[in-house]
Amino acid sequence: MSENTTATTRARRKVREGLVVSDKMEKTVVVEVEDRVKHALYGKIMRRTSKLKVHDEQNSAGIGDRVLIMETRPLSATKRWRLVEILEKAK
């Protein structure tokens, strides 16, 4: 009569675009991501940046590259993002 269907659906992963600011670590790059936030009281649109550590398996990204990153499971104490693709190489 009653069916127990436990369909576990995975939540949508966050995807961000950012600029590589450091590539000094092995298989890790630091990406600066910009977020535009409206001030709660005054309504001004502000730019807020955050630096994220991103897993780069092939060590292919360099400083100044524009990259696409995706949220993933925790890979280390501070890494929760992985590199999806390099959108534009630095000149």
Curated annotation (Swiss-Prot):
Tagged with keyword Transferase: no
Alphabetized InterPro entries for the sequence: NA-bd_OB-fold, Ribosomal_uS17, Ribosomal_uS17_bact/chlr, Ribosomal_uS17_CS
GO CC annotation: cytosolic small ribosomal subunit
Coiled coil: none
Subunit composition and interactions: Part of the 30S ribosomal subunit.
Recorded GO MF terms: rRNA binding; structural constituent of ribosome
The protein's role, per its UniProt record: One of the primary rRNA binding proteins, it binds specifically to the 5'-end of 16S ribosomal RNA.
Membership in a protein family: Belongs to the universal ribosomal protein uS17 family.
Highest taxon of source: Bacteria
Signal peptide (residue range): none
GO biological process, one term: translation
Pfam family, one: Ribosomal_S17
RNA-binding among keywords: yes
Protein name, UniProt field: Small ribosomal subunit protein uS17
Entry keyword set: Ribonucleoprotein, Ribosomal protein, RNA-binding, rRNA-binding
